[in-house]
């Protein structure tokens, strides 16, 4: 799958890594599919992942570092 809108450059300006972007988009897409209200009125994409990416690009959805989980193994 190739992302053309929103551009990957715009998305990465909002999130610090591709990994964080993919996790954030997946979590938001699940929330949208579960019935959470969207943060934008109009979307170019019909699918939940596309809508999540549009919300991230618009700055409506961000990573909350206070709730980030890090598991380290010795």
UniProtKB/Swiss-Prot annotation:
NCBIfam families: rpoZ. The keyword Nucleotidyltransferase applies. It comes from Lactobacillus acidophilus (strain ATCC 700396 / NCK56 / N2 / NCFM). Belongs to the RNA polymerase subunit omega family. It comes from the Bacteria. The RNAP catalytic core consists of 2 alpha, 1 beta, 1 beta' and 1 omega subunit. When a sigma factor is associated with the core the holoenzyme is formed, which can initiate transcription. GO terms for biological process: DNA-templated transcription. Promotes RNA polymerase assembly. Latches the N- and C-terminal regions of the beta' subunit thereby facilitating its interaction with the beta and alpha subunits. It catalyses: RNA(n) + a ribonucleoside 5'-triphosphate = RNA(n+1) + diphosphate. Pfam families: RNA_pol_Rpb6. This is DNA-directed RNA polymerase subunit omega. One of its GO terms (cellular component) is DNA-directed RNA polymerase complex. One of its GO terms (molecular function) is DNA binding. Its EC number is 2.7.7.6. The keyword Ribonucleoprotein does not apply. Keywords: DNA-directed RNA polymerase, Nucleotidyltransferase, Transcription, Transferase. InterPro entries: DNA-dir_RNA_pol_omega (IPR003716), Pol_omega/Rpo6/RPB6 (IPR006110), RPB6/omega-like_sf (IPR036161).
């Amino acid at each position: 799958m190739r992302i053309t809108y929103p551009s990957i450059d715009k998305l990465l300006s909002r999130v610090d890594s591709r990994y964080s972007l993919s996790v954030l988009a997946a979590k938001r897409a699940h929330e949208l599919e579960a019935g959470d209200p969207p943060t934008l009125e109009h979307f170019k994409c019909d699918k939940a992942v596309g809508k999540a990416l549009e919300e991230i690009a618009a700055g409506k959805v961000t990573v909350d570092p206070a709730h980030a989980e890090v598991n380290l193994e010795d």
